[in-house]
Structure formats: C-alpha cells, structure tokens
Amino acid sequence: MDPLPRRASLQNTGNVGEGWVRQYLCQQGWQILAQRWRCPWGELDLVAHKADVLIFVEVKTRSPGSWDRGGLLAVGIPKQRRLIRAAQAFLSQHPHLSELSCRFDVALIERRASGEGVSYALVDYLQAAFEIC
C-alpha cells in the first residue's frame, strides 16, 4: 500500500480536528492568532488570545480505542519541549504578546466513522496541560 494516501488522510483528519477546536475556542471568546504556525522546532496547532492570556493549543485527533489514550500519550515530555521551544520562537516574532500570561492546552478530538459518514467530538480539553519547567 502506498503510504502517501494514508498520510494525506491523516493530515486531513488532523486539519478537521484543528478546525473543530478553532470553532470551539471562537465560541468561547478566544481570538485565533495563528493556526499550524511552523518554525524549526515544530508546529503550533493553534495560538489564541483572550484578555491577558495567550494559549498554545496542541490538538490530537484520534479514532476510538487508539493506542495513545485518545492522543494524550502523544504529548509526552519530548513533545512538550518542542512545543515550548516553538512557543518561544512565536513570542520572539511577536514581542508585543510576550507580556501576556501563557498557557499550554491540549484538545483531544475523537473521529468516529459510521454508515452515515464521519463525525468529530471534543472528548477532553485540558487547560494548562503542562507547564514550563
């Protein structure tokens, strides 16, 4: 089997999950500043601002029964370090935001396939999922 179609399918699933979380955050009053922001250390799925808080959101979209507990285990210490470095790079390019309180959130989205098609649901939204140590 050619891995490219599967990779494209997984990327599309991730994009749909990010779009779902983006909509959720906007409904909660957050202003989205960036989506899929890239730097040498990785990618920030979503960056949002509300009042005096800036959040960096890692979105994990999985099928039910995934090996990594719905994506939660995929945000281990190495991934957290990459996200922190990427956030520092983002702030260095946007110094006017550096005085805001920063938080790292993780959104877990479940992708369910059925005879009627595919649906997505927010399983958990972890505010302050990890901290800068």
Swiss-Prot record:
Gene3D superfamilies: 3.40.1350.10. This is UPF0102 protein CYA_0680. Belongs to the UPF0102 family. SUPFAM superfamilies: Restriction endonuclease-like. One of its GO terms (molecular function) is nucleic acid binding. Pfam families: UPF0102. It comes from Synechococcus sp. (strain JA-3-3Ab).
